[in-house]
């Protein structure tokens, strides 16, 4: 409570300072000198209260570059080319960057994504017309990629279907189960494997290409087929040889090299650890404005936002039932006789997660 009283006092005195500045400006030299002293005192006052505040509120530690997985520049450069190349999709008509776009915060600005077969990007992307209209939208929206390369991230996707776990003896719990490819650098590389095998995301419809047929029969047979596309592209072969020490010719390229490159790009491209808030947490008491400080007071105080949005990444990585009914088609669980999205329960088999 002491902290909040201080902040309240700070806001009031700041208002007085602003009034004084507006009234003393453009006056005579004597008043300008008074204004100068006002501004000096204001700066000292802000530093004192903000430093005191940072010790009172339970604030997270600032994010640092060392909090993220290492991103090799050569692999990241290669990953950026793969990320925006349609070669990884079944019909070669969509890339990762179609649904994870810089202009839309690394997502697509849509409530439910329009994957393979759509036209355009972002909110203006459409499902096509007539016989070319896609059969189904992506059941859930495209995740934003910011800071997913942080080392503490242990679970991905809305239902947590990709997580760090040794349940299958390969370090990760995924839809591929024990058929997950080896030599994956991190959980981002793991996640990058799956959109290219999903019918409504990147793979396409049955009968249109070999990738979707292989993925449907046995998922781990689709990845070699995708890899062969890269192996047959001489420009990519040279880039892989340059980026990876264990690649001497096209036959050495594996799906793990492809997704490890994409992961390296995501880590480097969407890492945020230099915001004004990070600067404030490092001790720069003037990094945040008065309004931002008020918001921080609420966020970590009586609004209780930080109860769930905690830590340096503003998440505790847990799942909660927030008492909202399903709206939209969602993702129906395999073999479920009802058309419904059971959310986290699809992964956990726990009725409390429905």
Predicted regions, residues:
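Bacterial N-terminal signal peptides
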Residues: 40-50
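A generic alpha-helix propensity feature with a strong bias for hydrophobic helices
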Residues: 18, 25, 45-46, 63, ...
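Hydrophobic transmembrane signal anchors and adjacent membrane-proximal interface regions, especially
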Residues: 5-7, 44-46, 56, 164
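Periplasmic c-type cytochrome electron-transfer domains
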Residues: 54-354
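N-terminal secretory signal peptides that target proteins for export/translocation
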Residues: 1-35
């Amino acid at each position: 409570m002491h902290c909040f009283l201080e902040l309240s006092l700070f806001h009031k005195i700041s208002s007085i300072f602003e009034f004084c500045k507006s009234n003393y400006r453009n006056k005579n030299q004597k008043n300008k000198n008074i204004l100068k002293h006002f501004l000096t005192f204001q700066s000292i006052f802000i530093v004192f209260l903000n430093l005191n505040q940072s010790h009172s509120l339970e604030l997270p530690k600032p994010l640092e570059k060392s909090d993220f997985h290492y991103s090799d520049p050569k692999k990241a450069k290669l990953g950026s080319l793969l990320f925006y190349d349609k070669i990884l999709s079944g019909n070669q008509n969509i890339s990762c960057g179609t649904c994870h776009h810089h202009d839309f915060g690394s997502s697509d600005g849509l409530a439910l994504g329009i994957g393979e077969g759509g036209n355009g990007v972002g909110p203006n992307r459409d499902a096509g017309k007539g016989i070319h209209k896609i059969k189904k939208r992506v059941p859930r929206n495209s995740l934003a990629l910011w800071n997913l390369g942080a080392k503490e991230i242990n679970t991905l996707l809305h239902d947590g279907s990709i997580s760090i776990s040794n349940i299958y003896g390969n370090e990760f719990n995924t839809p591929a189960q024990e058929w997950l490819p080896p030599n994956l650098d991190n959980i981002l590389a793991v996640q990058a494997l799956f959109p290219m095998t999903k019918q409504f995301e990147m793979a396409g419809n049955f009968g249109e290409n070999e990738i979707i047929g292989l993925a449907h029969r046995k998922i781990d047979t689709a990845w070699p087929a995708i890899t062969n596309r890269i192996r047959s592209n001489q420009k990519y072969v040279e880039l892989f040889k340059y980026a990876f020490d264990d690649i001497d010719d096209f036959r050495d390229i594996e799906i793990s090299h492809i997704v490890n490159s994409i992961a390296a790009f995501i880590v480097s491209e969407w890492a945020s650890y230099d915001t004004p808030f990070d600067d404030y947490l490092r001790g720069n008491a003037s990094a945040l404005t008065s309004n931002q400080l008020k918001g921080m007071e609420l966020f970590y105080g009586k609004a209780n936002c930080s109860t769930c949005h905690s830590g340096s990444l503003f998440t505790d990585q847990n799942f909660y039932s927030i008492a909202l009914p399903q709206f939209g088609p969602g993702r129906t669980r395999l073999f479920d006789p009802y058309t419904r999205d059971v959310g986290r329960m699809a992964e956990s088999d726990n009725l409390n997660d429905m």
